[in-house]
Amino acid sequence: MEGSTGFDGDATTFFAPDAVFGDRVRRFQEFLDTFTSYRDSVRSIQVYNSNNAANYNDDQDDADERDLLGDDDGDDLEKEKKAASSTSLNILPHRIIISLDDLREFDRSFWSGILVEPAYFIPPAEKALTDLADSMDDVPHPNASAVSSRHPWKLSFKGSFGAHALSPRTLTAQHLNKLVSVEGIVTKTSLVRPKLIRSVHYAAKTGRFHYRDYTDATTTLTTRIPTPAIYPTEDTEGNKLTTEYGYSTFIDHQRITVQEMPEMAPAGQLPRSIDVILDDDLVDKTKPGDRVNVVGVFKSLGAGGMNQSNSNTLIGFKTLILGNTVYPLHARSTGVAARQMLTDFDIRNINKLSKKKDIFDILSQSLAPSIYGHDHIKKAILLMLMGGVEKNLENGSHLRGDINILMVGDPSTAKSQLLRFVLNTASLAIATTGRGSSGVGLTAAVTTDRETGERRLEAGAMVLADRGVVCIDEFDKMTDVDRVAIHEVMEQQTVTIAKAGIHTTLNARCSVIAAANPVFGQYDVNRDPHQNIALPDSLLSRFDLLFVVTDDINEIRDRSISEHVLRTHRYLPPGYLEGEPVRERLNLSLAVGEDADINPEEHSNSGAGVENEGEDDEDHVFEKFNPLLQAGAKLAKNKGNYNGTEIPKLVTIPFLRKYVQYAKERVIPQLTQEAINVIVKNYTDLRNDDNTKKSPITARTLETLIRLATAHAKVRLSKTVNKVDAKVAANLLRFALLGEDIGNDIDEEESEYEEALSKRSPQKSPKKRQRVRQPASNSGSPIKSTPRRSTASSVNATPSSARRILRFQDDEQNAGEDDNDIMSPLPADEEAELQRRLQLGLRVSPRRREHLHAPEEGSSGPLTEVGTPRLPNVSSAGQDDEQQQSVISFDNVEPGTISTGRLSLISGIIARLMQTEIFEEESYPVASLFERINEELPEEEKFSAQEYLAGLKIMSDRNNLMVADDKVWRV
């Protein structure tokens, strides 16, 4: 600056250029000449910044020229002005990362000096880097001089730190003034504030400028006497000075607190922490909850020494780390959005995999393959990771695209394990617990800044998880006051704060996946869902999917789970012999910051893709199936067949993250008319279904169907949401609400439903149609009949029930058909599918059972249902019976004994049947109920008459039901 002078005695930030300093500068210049990759990095930053600055200045010049044109161009000109003004100058910081391994290979003494005496080796190295940048700087555009390399360049370090890789607990006095690497969790972050480096003052009388440099313990690597924080008011001649703030130099300044990782802390001791000072381009890189690796110089502030109150004792000095680099640890980070670098090789594999017909099953089976079962929950989690499409309408309405999931059920059903898997898989996920989180801890809190004393906002878990996932365990343990705080977040996706003079709105656009236990500790099937969950309907309706996970007693399933758990305990990591103790994994950072640079060539040449997935090379897409750990995926691949031999294809977790990231960023599906028709029909069916009267079916359920269908379209990388996506969404929602698993029958039922609708008469309602049977003699007078009762899994207005009713409509074509035509055997594939559903204990309609157990051609004898226990005194009723079924007498049957597990099974089935239409008159015949119960069970689990009567007697004694007049009455 022309005519500027400094003040005598001022401390400067530069070292005096002595001979040793110059030798170190020349030595580091030789290092940069040897490793040309660093020179290329400097040049690339210069070119990027100059081009960006040139484009920015050109846009500003064009905007100024357009201002002279007036308002002739109307709205178009205004839009161009807004677009030009929104363009911001985006330049890269003048900082490059140096590998300590390369420096050790070049000059071991210089490498040792960087680690042991950074205050005397880093400044000459940065001086050499700045001189190199100045010599390479040729500004190609006259308007881009603002980003010239005359600004000093900084060095960051990565590589092996050896004994200097520490934690906050292992930092000792011997590490003072040395370069260290510290791993930990960020617990506190201060506000980013400007720090004065140089003040400029103007003397009006002499017309000269004066400056003063300011240093403190956090500015320089060496501990010097700090500069007084007082502006000069007069120059040496006594002339009055005016501070020119525009000419003064400021840098950003932030203080963070890094705490020791809990897994590294010794048993029984609290984690320790250390303060880190971040300046300039390092500020605002982390937030509370992030796991980071900080590289910096460990030094003392100098504040300490003799105790003021008692001069005979000494107190310790305050220490901190002057940050040099901050590396986020994405593998275990809970607050940093881990963005994967997608190479051309990855994109090709993603596109090839998306064309597979079973892509939804492949990706869902790859989610937590070690967890046995829960196939529908895994599919829902995959759709939650994909998310729907967020929309902000012109009228100010906000339609969220994030999917919320709630899991409620018995203990020990892997609910928390699923949450942990989401926490370690999602790009941005934060974990909380119900009792350990408060309302302000989830949303935002108003605190006092310890440096300035001002009121400030601290973001809670949901604000920190913006554009991510919040995992809340033990959701039922939260108090009502704290739970109310998340109502706004789950629907409006904002947090409104009005306290302590602060009124603001924060974004909290996150998905919520929560796990809760029932009110009574175990889910009671005899009670309604809302009585078991004990959460208000206003909160339940905000969850898109609510899964009830029960620990049912099933001998086959229990044996398979126990074998799976035992196989997991038998697993040995690679390289270990049987009986050899597994050594504790050492968390030593042998290479700090190596993940910062990703070489695409390594990814493209080191693994096999989708096309050569069977080769012996390392595969980055599919992983090898491990029967000891991934038996759950094999069960899902074989559709619940415990003896299945089909091996699943499992995608690796890193590739799954890339697939989800690609689908969320690149694909925005649009609804089609056929998908809209399916969504509207399923929504109206659910609203008019008697089985969903006790569950809140609101307009949010309609948006749930849209979000699920859109997320499924993202799984296929489709630009449109078609009928298949809507059917999958409806199937998943119906399973969450009613426990129905339509499975592979959904396409068949939909086609038959539409065909029946096209043929039915418009004068008659399908609910009032009765099944009309024509006698074999074709006499012309139909037999009086009543509508066939549906099972617990049937729904009045669903396609399945409509198909069953409309198939036997009273038109001329069906009136003459023989009843035996209905009992024709099924094809082999359909029969195998029904057998599979029976083995799993899934609900199968009685009519499909009749198809399954139909006699072969040429067989004689009456039609009897296979597996139903034959009871004594069975007589057919030809008269006009209420149920049009065979009357079974229990007069000569004595109640037997029933085990606890079998009693729980029959209680659950009866409780579910009591909520269906068969108990419309508050009662149902004992014999007919016996047949209904056995219709829902596989062959090996059907109840005998003695077990059935024993179960009724126990339930009657417990006042769960009443038996009178050969009927079971609902209490």
From Swiss-Prot:
Compositional bias per record (Polar residues), positions renumbered to this chain: 775-801, 873-889
Annotated MCM domain residues: 359-566
Consequence the record notes for mutating K415A: No effect on MCM2-7 complex helicase activity. Loss of MCM2-7 complex helicase activity. Reduces MCM2-7 complex helicase activity
An example Gene Ontology molecular-function term: MCM complex binding
Composition skew (Acidic residues), residue ranges: 58-77, 811-821
Gene3D superfamilies (UniProt xref): 2.20.28.10, mini-chromosome maintenance (MCM) complex, chain A, domain 1, Nucleic acid-binding proteins, P-loop containing nucleotide triphosphate hydrolases
Class of enzymatic activity (EC top level): hydrolase
Record-listed ATP binding positions: G409, D410, P411, S412, T413, A414, K415, S416
Chain segments carrying region Disordered: 52-78, 594-614, 749-825, 842-893
Catalytic activity: ATP + H2O = ADP + phosphate + H(+)
UniProt modified residues of type Phosphothreonine: T868
GO CC annotation, single: nuclear pre-replicative complex
Location of this chain's protein in the cell: Nucleus
Family matches, as InterPro entries: AAA+_ATPase (IPR003593), MCM (IPR031327), Mcm3 (IPR008046), MCM3_WHD (IPR054007), MCM_CS (IPR018525), MCM_dom (IPR001208), MCM_lid (IPR041562), MCM_N (IPR027925)
An example Gene Ontology biological process: silent mating-type cassette heterochromatin formation
Biased composition (Basic residues): 761-772
Role this protein plays: Acts as a component of the MCM2-7 complex (MCM complex) which is the putative replicative helicase essential for 'once per cell cycle' DNA replication initiation and elongation in eukaryotic cells. The active ATPase sites in the MCM2-7 ring are formed through the interaction surfaces of two neighboring subunits such that a critical structure of a conserved arginine finger motif is provided in trans relative to the ATP-binding site of the Walker A box of the adjacent subunit. The six ATPase active sites, however, are likely to contribute differentially to the complex helicase activity.
PANTHER family: DNA REPLICATION LICENSING FACTOR MCM FAMILY MEMBER (PTHR11630), DNA REPLICATION LICENSING FACTOR MCM3-RELATED (PTHR11630:SF46)
Misc remark: Present with 35100 molecules/cell in log phase SD medium. Early fractionation of eukaryotic MCM proteins yielded a variety of dimeric, trimeric and tetrameric complexes with unclear biological significance. The MCM2-7 hexamer is the proposed physiological active complex.
Family: Belongs to the MCM family.
UniProt-recorded name of the protein: DNA replication licensing factor MCM3
Origin species: Saccharomyces cerevisiae (strain ATCC 204508 / S288c)
Gene (name only): MCM3
